[in-house]
Design a protein with these regions (language model features):
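Feature captures hydrophobic
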Residues: 1-125
Length: 125
């Protein structure tokens, strides 16, 4: 899983459509749709909070380095957040909140700056 490129790969209209299909029925959304929605949301996070202080991982779909501040240049970043696709999309759309996901163990965060509270919900519906 490599960090997202600096250029968008998913056209925003297609990404929003994938997110809407997922929102309508998360359990019935095809895997390819979930993948597109996750990647679109990661690209959107990168676009709104560029930087290299924090790495957000949503395996197996993607990862992005974002948020301004001290950056790392080698190895594992000091600030990492990892979660599954359902948790990521729930957070992005406002269907769950950061504190609840962290307390519930569906988000794994390590590092002093490993938080997304200032950036969520990213794409509320």
């Amino acid at each position: 899983m490599e960090p997202m490129p600096s250029r968008r790969r998913i056209p925003p209209a297609e990404g929003r459509q994938a997110l809407e299909v997922w929102r309508a029925d998360p359990s019935a959304a095809p895997k390819v749709t979930v993948a597109m929605a996750v990647r679109y949301a990661l690209e959107e996070l990168w676009a709104r909070a560029p930087g290299r202080t924090l790495e957000v991982r949503v395996p197996p779909y993607g990862a992005v380095q974002c948020v301004q501040g001290p950056r790392h240049t080698r190895g594992t970043p000091p600030n990492v957040i990892e979660m599954d696709a359902r948790t990521w999309l729930d957070l992005v759309t406002g269907q769950s909140d950061w504190a609840g996901a962290l307390a519930g163990g569906t988000v794994h965060a390590s590092g002093q700056r490993a938080t997304l509270t200032d950036h969520l919900p990213l794409l509320p519906g």
